[in-house]
């Protein structure tokens, strides 16, 4: 992979913007790769009706401006480049002349287009869409969301723009001059042809999405545009655009086949780099772009789990058995095991490797002796078991056994969860000191793309590792429990038909 050469004396900082599902984060990275400043704002979630999830695009932009202003107030360093990473699949429509959105963005978790997805399957589109895009037909992806927006919010007119969250923020950062996305985000829309590396005309026609409303597709790494002077007080290059999971993969140094990372957030996402060619999964994993530069494109296999950290939130908000998410660790550790209780976290259906929109959550094995501790432990074990399902599928598709799992995301602070994960997988689990790895990946991409940093391998190797969890004495017991949990998964399948 080709990067610009670093200058002899590097000064300033790289600004990473992480436009996540639950929050907007800005981090400044100094020349050593350390975090020099940071700011965060929570994104309000909008639930118009059951199964629908939306975000206000204007709020996302306002919060972005706030975190940028805050990190600039914390550090006088001049921003040498901007890197951007974002929640993928979430999409919106807006007016080019005014920059005003046509309603809220539809979030990746939103299931309102499930019926359209079923119709596409019934019409025989499953195999063609899989072959072209590497994805399964699911309401998770942008394609059916955009079709819904055009049908229900605003039909096509000259000057209508559409895009994912990266495109929206690039539009705003550049003062409306640039309408673009990168290959990693485009590959998550179910409209991007992996073989031509462009929007697929037949799929656009199928869903009545005009090509002219979509952003131009650019490399993930390298200078894409310049910020409007009103954003920072001066202009700076936007030089790294990556979907959040690809950004984490980049930060972990997973740039070749056999390296796997898992991000534990609201959902969990396991991604393995597969090299310079797309591999079609035989186990219901997604084929996607890892990242690209001006000369090459790397590919990946991904398993998306819809409900992991959200399961812990359900313990707090739904059952009320904990007051904060952090309490889940102590509560689960207060009992030696789950007491035969198993949890299937299909609260929004099942993602990889099942892709069952009709599956529903299941808590089974309850007796009069079951209490809060057993339920909390069953939830943490279920997160580890789900991850095992996907790592097994990755190993089968790639023909390479998993030897180490690199992890990041808010839930990895839970030491019990990480130990359970190591035991269930039977391999070391590596946790870095900086668990905001998506922002770090965006910073690395922007810095390497502008010559702020010169060597990718050295940059990755310099990241401090906080702890490596080794599989322990409960490995065999938990792997036996995994087999029982798989029976519970089968009971949860196709509950809603």
UniProtKB/Swiss-Prot annotation:
The lineage of its organism: Bacteria, Bacillati, Cyanobacteriota, Cyanophyceae, Gloeobacterales. Its EC number is 2.7.1.30. Inhibited by fructose 1,6-bisphosphate (FBP). It comes from Gloeobacter violaceus (strain ATCC 29082 / PCC 7421). This is Glycerol kinase. ATP binds at residues 21-22, 266, 309, 313, 410. Pathway: Polyol metabolism; glycerol degradation via glycerol kinase pathway; sn-glycerol 3-phosphate from glycerol: step 1/1. GO terms for biological process: glycerol catabolic process; glycerol metabolic process; glycerol-3-phosphate metabolic process. ADP binds at residues 21, 25, 266, 309, 410, 414.
